[in-house]
């Protein structure tokens, strides 16, 4: 049955529905699959924590987090990213964690086509090269646009302290 804000399958008593972005309203969930989109935009860890806790009520439950980089390196997204990186580089063993991080490595030239392709595994499929290369050119020409471009299209974490001012141009 397809409802306005959910799907319901009577034969399995299963429901698929979007939930509130307010963690305080989510207590009591019994989650089999949770998809948290754009974790970098979460101001607090409340939703992440209540959803993660709700996974303990079912066998083989799964929480899938999808996000780009962001600007808040003190938030839940950067914390989760750090944990995933530690699992991937084997400095932490946690069989409950699996992750894939597409982005640039230190030393990669963010202005190159290779960087765009590396950070965007769906390049040319759902990521439109002509759009992203145009945005890249804008970010190169307008340094104040570089931080947003790098977080959204190259998965590079930037902060307000990151200097994207074109100092050679400033000094002229």
Language-model regions: role of each:
Residues 1-32:
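Inter-Walker segment of RecA-like/P-loop motor cores
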Residues 3, 45-172:
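Non-catalytic, compositionally simple segments
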Residues 37-38:
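Walker B catalytic acidic pair
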């Amino acid at each position: 049955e397809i409802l306005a804000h959910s799907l319901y399958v009577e034969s399995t008593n299963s429901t698929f529905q979007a939930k509130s972005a307010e963690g305080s309203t989510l207590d009591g969930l019994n989650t089999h699959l949770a998809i948290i989109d754009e974790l970098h935009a979460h101001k607090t860890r409340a939703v992440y924590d209540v959803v993660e806790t709700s996974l303990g009520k079912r066998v083989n439950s799964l929480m899938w987090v999808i996000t780009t980089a962001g600007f808040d390196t003190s938030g839940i997204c950067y914390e989760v990213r750090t944990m995933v990186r530690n699992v991937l580089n084997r400095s932490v063993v946690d069989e409950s964690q699996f992750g894939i991080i597409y982005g640039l490595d230190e030393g990669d030239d963010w202005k190159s086509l290779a960087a765009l392709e590396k950070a965007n595994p769906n390049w040319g499929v759902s990521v439109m090269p002509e759009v992203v290369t145009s945005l890249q050119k804008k970010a190169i020409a307008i340094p104040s646009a570089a931080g947003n471009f790098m977080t959204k299209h190259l998965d590079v974490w930037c902060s307000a302290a990151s200097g994207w001012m074109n100092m050679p141009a400033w000094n002229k």
